[in-house]
């Protein structure tokens, strides 16, 4: 059984060999399934200008049309219950290809892909220095000043941030969900029920946070599905997401879907020798089935009871028109459904359990390299976003693809669902609490580039039916 290790606990030359393998794989032709470029294109490939910034560096560029149309490129699964198993398969075959390249260069026979556990920033048992270190892209991957000379191939141009925002790596909204999926498109750990979905609309909580938000925080190639896998840190990021799935599954009351529509779905890749292979979701339901485990790391399990399944809910209020997101937006008033006409209230639940309240951000369209967006909710006039009314953050990973009608997408944009029950419960303690006076605020974490456009179709607030 192989063991994938925490990158900050490595005591060997794992990253040195990784850098050498990346260099070797970059030297291979883009039409070679074992090349760095082909492996990146499995996740996503495009020829619009911002993507070509990275793709025109590929050996042998442009690829043949036969390669582009082979059915192996642009296969990443997003906004779907296949997100986690597809990326586990993707990492497995990538790791095999890298390990073979390392062996062929005379390296160790047991090389494994490390993981970057940025979630350690939430480990209250860790030292402040270790919490802060966890947020930093490992120094072997270079800095904003350029590559680390000893690991030059682990750097890529245009990364926006080398230190993540702590809010962007919070594992608990996902880890505290009890259900992997549900058929109603409501909040779940692993995503909603779909078919093949290169750009789906049923995003699970783990995909939403930390996955999407880390992508857009680092930005550059990582901020776009059509270039993300060209950044060497992509693979360590996804190893951590893969690890979190395994940690979640080991907790009481959690399980993967049992229906054949999930278990029997198959995807195509290439093995270490560049030969086509097919694998089913049921073959990757645990890491042990693929012959590897992760070293124990935070979080080892949830610290709170699993959230109850999302019950029947009703709209409490919503914005009355679409709106654009700028660098600093004033809070937006929600138009509240008159109390006699709605079946839900923002009141404490009867019988002990707290009511679940969900904030939905729907039909988000746009373009450009967006930064993560912080979300706030308040009941006070002129109250700006602050820690007390912070409810979460979203990353618009795949925004342009989701906004463009195509075979893979209906062009309706991205959708998000955030459980804001805890914040609503806190606000309810205020003397001036008024459930018919609710405002939301969306604030980008950094100044957006001039070519960024973000339009939100609707923000709506949903609560349990009384």
Curated annotation (Swiss-Prot):
Binding site for Cu cation B: 211, 215, 238
Record bears the keyword Metal-binding: yes
Post-translational modification: In vitro, the C-terminal lid-domain is slowly cleaved off in an autoprocessive time dependent manner, leading to the formation of cleaved-HcTyr1. The processing rate is not influenced by factors such as pH and added metal ions.
Details of cofactor binding: Binds 2 copper ions per subunit.
pH effect on activity, per entry: Optimum pH is between 6 and 8. Exhibits a relatively broad pH range of activities (over 50% of activity between pH 4.5 and 9.5).
Record's keyword terms, sorted: Copper, Metal-binding, Oxidoreductase
Sample GO molecular function, one term: catechol oxidase activity
The UniProt record lists the keyword Metal-binding: yes
Regulation: Cleavage of the lid-domain increases activity levels, affinity for substrate and turnover rate. Exhibits high saline tolerance.
Cofactor: Cu(2+)
Binding-site positions, Cu cation A: 43, 78, 87
Taxonomy, superkingdom: Bacteria
Catalytic activity, reaction form: L-tyrosine + O2 = L-dopaquinone + H2O; 2 L-tyrosine + O2 = 2 L-dopa; 2 L-dopa + O2 = 2 L-dopaquinone + 2 H2O
EC numbers, comma separated: 1.14.18.1
Influence of temperature on activity: Optimum temperature is approximately 40 degrees Celsius. Maintains 60-50% of activity between 40 and 65 degrees Celsius and retains 30% of activity at 72 degrees Celsius.
The record's note on its domains: The latent-HcTyr1 form contains a C-terminal lid-domain (LID), which is hampering substrate accessibility to the active site.
Family to which this protein belongs: Belongs to the tyrosinase family.
Assembly and binders: Monomer. Formation of a dimer is observed when the protein is in its holo-form.
Chain's role: Copper-containing oxidase that catalyzes the conversion of L-tyrosine to L-dopa and then to L-dopaquinone. Can use various phenols such as p-coumaric acid, phenol, pyrocatechol, syringol or pyrogallol. Accepts several of the constituents of lignin and potentially participates in lignin functionalization.
Stated name of the protein: Tyrosinase HcTyr1
Upper taxonomic lineage: Bacteria, Pseudomonadati, Pseudomonadota, Gammaproteobacteria, Oceanospirillales
């Amino acid at each position: 059984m192989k063991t994938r290790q925490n990158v900050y606990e490595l005591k060997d030359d794992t990253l040195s060999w990784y850098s050498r393998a990346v260099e070797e794989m970059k030297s291979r032709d883009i039409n070679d399934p074992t090349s760095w470029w082909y492996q990146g294109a499995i996740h996503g490939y495009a020829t619009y200008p911002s993507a070509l910034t990275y793709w025109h560096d590929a050996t042998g560029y442009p690829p043949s049309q036969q390669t582009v149309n082979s059915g192996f490129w642009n296969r990443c699964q997003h906004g779907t219950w296949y997100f986690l198993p597809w990326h586990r398969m993707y990492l497995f075959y990538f790791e095999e290809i890298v390990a073979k390249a390392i062996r062929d260069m005379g390296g160790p026979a047991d090389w494994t892909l490390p993981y970057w556990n940025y979630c350690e920033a939430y480990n209250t048992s860790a030292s402040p220095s270790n919490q802060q270190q966890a947020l930093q892209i490992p120094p072997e991957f270079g800095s904003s000043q350029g590559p680390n000379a000893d690991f030059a191939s682990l750097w890529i141009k245009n990364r926006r941030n080398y230190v993540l925002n702590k809010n962007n790596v919070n594992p608990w909204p996902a880890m505290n969900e009890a259900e992997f999926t549900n058929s109603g498109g409501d909040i779940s750990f692993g995503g909603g029920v779909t078919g093949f979905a290169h750009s789906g609309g049923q995003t699970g909580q783990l995909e939403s946070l930390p996955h999407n938000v880390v992508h857009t925080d680092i930005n550059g190639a990582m901020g776009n599905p059509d270039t993300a896998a060209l950044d060497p840190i992509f693979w360590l990021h996804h190893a951590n997401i893969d690890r979190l799935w395994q940690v979640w599954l080991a907790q009481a009351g959690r399980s993967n879907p049992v229906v054949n529509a999930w278990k029997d779905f198959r995807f195509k890749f290439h093995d270490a020798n560049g030969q086509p292979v097919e694998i089913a979701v049921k073959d990757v339901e645990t890491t042990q089935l693929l012959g590897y485990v992760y070293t124990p790391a935070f979080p080892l399990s949830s610290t709170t009871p699993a959230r109850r399944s999302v019950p029947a809910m009703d709209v409490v209020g919503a914005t009355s028109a679409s709106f654009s997101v700028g660098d600093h937006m004033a809070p937006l008033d929600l138009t509240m459904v008159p109390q006699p006409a709605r079946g839900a209230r923002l009141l404490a639940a009867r019988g002990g359990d707290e009511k679940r309240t969900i904030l939905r951000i729907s039909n988000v369209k746009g373009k450009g390299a967006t930064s993560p967006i912080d979300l706030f909710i308040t009941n006070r006039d002129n109250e700006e976003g602050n820690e007390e009314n912070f409810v979460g953050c979203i990353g618009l990973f795949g925004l342009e693809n989701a906004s463009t009608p195509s075979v893979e997408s209906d062009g309706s944009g991205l959708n998000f669902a955030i459980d804001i029950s805890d914040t609503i419960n806190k606000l309810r303690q205020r003397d001036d609490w008024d459930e018919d006076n609710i405002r939301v605020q969306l604030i980008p974490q950094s100044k957006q580039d001039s070519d960024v456009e973000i339009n939100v179709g609707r923000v709506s607030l949903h609560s349990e039916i009384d």
